[in-house]
Amino acid sequence: MSPAAQASGVMLSVRDAHVAYGTGVVALQGVSLEVRVGEAVALVGANGAGKTTLLKTIAGLLSPRSGEIWFDGHRIDGVEAPDRVDLGIALVPEGRRLFSRLSVAENLRLGTFRDRDPKRRQEMLERVFGLFPVLRQRVDQRAGTLSGGEGQMLSIARALMSRPRFLMLDEPSLGIMPRIVDSILDVLQMLHRQEGLTVLLVEQNVPAALAAAERGYVLQTGRIVAEGTSQSLLDSDLVRRAYLGM
């Protein structure tokens, strides 16, 4: 960690980010948020609010028209996506984005494609098999034949293969049985609480997302409209009316 980040305790800082797609559709309008070192933060909002756009912008897959992104005390909005992975940023994308014709093992090795140390790559492979034992059982199976829950485990495990310090997850519960979701969230909470992994979690399941995080932000039509501790957001009239049906 850089001295600046260590002094402030902030790992990620998004400052007044504006993002628009080529059609001119504005997706983010002056978004600012912070994630502190070792913190788990939830980003919630309805479909089309801009949650996925924000994660892609942080990961370097989209470029902001204006605003700044800082990571570990350094400005990174001009840094290419693969180089952001080297900095310790990993994204588990919505819909998993697996290579369906490749095996589980081959998908996992793609998570370490920039690591030339075979011993370290094997260590990480054993580590993710320990977190998700079913993947060891399916190691030679094509990713396209996995169940939804197994596919999500593989997507998360692939991201963990890069040894991230900052992990972003986009709708990890989408299309998965509740008991599998609980199992996946348990693993993420263990990594966060026991190993200090910093997490930014995007979820439409607002209670589950806020239960897994210390703080949260509410994104609405490209703008942050609320932020606070998880409990304060659960208690807020805005969240209760818009997302909890109360």
Report each predicted region and the residues it spans.
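Helix-to-loop junction immediately C-terminal to a conserved catalytic motif
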Residues: 59
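The feature captures the beta-strand-to-loop junction immediately N-terminal to the Walker
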Residues: 44-46
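Conserved catalytic motifs of ABC-family nucleotide-binding domains
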Residues: 163
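Conserved ABC transporter NBD signature motif
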Residues: 67-76, 87, 120-125
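Helical segment within the ABC ATPase nucleotide-binding domain
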Residues: 182-196
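ABC ATPase C-loop
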Residues: 159-160
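Conserved ABC ATPase signature
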Residues: 142-146, 150
